Amino acid sequence: MADATTASPSMMTGASDSERIQPKRLFAFIIMVFGMFMAILDIQVVSASLTEIQAGLSASSTEVSWVQTAYLIAEVIAIPLSGFLSRALGTRLLFAISAFGFTASSLLCGFASSIEQMILWRALQGFLGAGMIPTVFASAYTIFPRSKFYIVAPVIGLVATLAPTVGPTVGGYITDLMSWHWLFFINIVPGVIITVGVLALVDFDQPNFALLDRFDWWGLIFMGGFLGSLEYVLEEGPQYEWLQDTSVAICAAICFVSAIAFFWRVLTAEEPIVDLYAFSNRNFAVGCVLQFCIGVGLYGLTYVYPRYLAEIRGYSALMIGETMFISGMTMFFMAPVVGRLMQKVDLRYIIAFGLVTFALGSWQMTWITREYDFYELLLPQILRGIGMMCAMVPTNNIALATLQPDRVKNASGLFNLMRNLGGAVGLAVINEVLNDRTDLHISRLQDRVTWGNTMAVETLNNFAQRLQGMGDSTLMAMKQLSQLVHRQAAVMGYGDAFFMLSLFYVALSLLVLFVNKPPSMAAGGGDAH
């Protein structure tokens, strides 16, 4: 095998040896990037509007949570499948089908009249739209010369990080100004434009329809069982006490059996549905681990911040979106900065700096109180945005830019899958930490709130005086004191979760030691060694 950790001259451009970016290809790529943005945005765009969707469809809180879960499960199955389909159908046809399917299912979601219909169409939306995400990553590293990667990488890195970050903001604004139906209708016009634009402009490669005759249906079934049940366990496990719930236990068993069957099939099939060969490249393997861990923070903090603001501060969806927008703005302005740094600084140093900066932003939140508001969250969110961009963008290059062009399509699906799985695992772990640590703090605080505690007695008396003439003031005061204890315990639980994340990302920064020095982004053509 050729040196798996450095790029050979034959890798440099994929489709072209020219250092000049063809305008047609550039415009086609920009259209594809917008498609990827829509697909990733729709993961989180409904998160701030689930209450409105629940009311509109007369659904229970458990049922409406599946509006997001169904999308995630379908997407995580489809993303690794895109590598095979991209080779069989070609980039043009696969992306057009994906964009059209995403647009059509968005229309169906907007017209859904029951929760069952909504869940079905959301699953279809996630499955069909998922193909756009890894296809953009693969195209970026095969159609552009290496000397232009420092321009292309920040663009796709920005979209991959910005879309889930601003999702709640966009969703909150749309629902507040119009209705939840427009969360889906707003995709229609851009989706049609993207579909037509891709069909007219994309000419990056040629399809190989003969591959469809060798499609591994058993591999698809095993992969669907493995990844779908894994996503379900991670999504539903924390709220149902994991294996104590029958459905979670059954899915865990399906996941275990399907995983064994899937890896056996991938390693023995003549034309496997997923090619694991890319993991023989050390930089790709380490990059996937980094991507998985970056997904923990990307999706984890997109969940933790809004939950704190809603649960402790009582913010509306719109107010939460406005507060969270700071991270998105920081990422936007950091994208060109990171692109410029990639020309001058070793990518490993940029990644390490990004991870430590992200850890610092989380560390500042370990002293969180129930008074933390927009201004207290300002600096941590700025650090989060800086850290995420500095970690994500160079990781994309380290993982994908050193692969042979014919390996990038399969590798891109695996690489993007790691980010989504990292997010799912991160959310499950963060939920578990929040629940366990909150219960622990409630127990400790209750042990201290006794009749012998002067401060507790004074607080209780103050509550009782304010509630005079409103019934049993003593009983109501005790209820208020109990609520105060539970709220304070929850805040302390958030502090513990942020502390855990800060330690995790400091430790993760050491992983860059295992990355072989990547070729310079300023190098072109044969200079990439």
PLM features per residue range, with description:
Residues 155-159, 290, 414-418:
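Hydrophobic alpha-helical segments of secondary membrane carriers
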Residues 23-83, 87, 92-95, 106, ...:
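Transmembrane core module of solute transporters
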Residues 184-199, 223-226, 251-255, 496-513:
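Symmetry-related core transmembrane helices of the 12-TM Major Facilitator Superfamily/SLC fold
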Residues 113, 145, 201-205, 238-239, ...:
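Short helix-capping/hinge motifs at transmembrane helix termini and TM-loop junctions
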Residues 107-111, 195-200, 260-264, 363-366, ...:
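Membrane-embedded alpha-helical segments of multi-pass transporters/permeases
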Residues 2-20:
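Short, Lys/Arg-rich, polar N-terminal cytosolic tail immediately upstream
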Residues 9-12, 63, 193, 398, ...:
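Hydrophobic transmembrane architecture of multi-pass small-molecule transporters
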Residues 48, 72, 79-219, 236, ...:
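Helix-loop-helix hairpins in multi-pass membrane proteins, especially solute transporters
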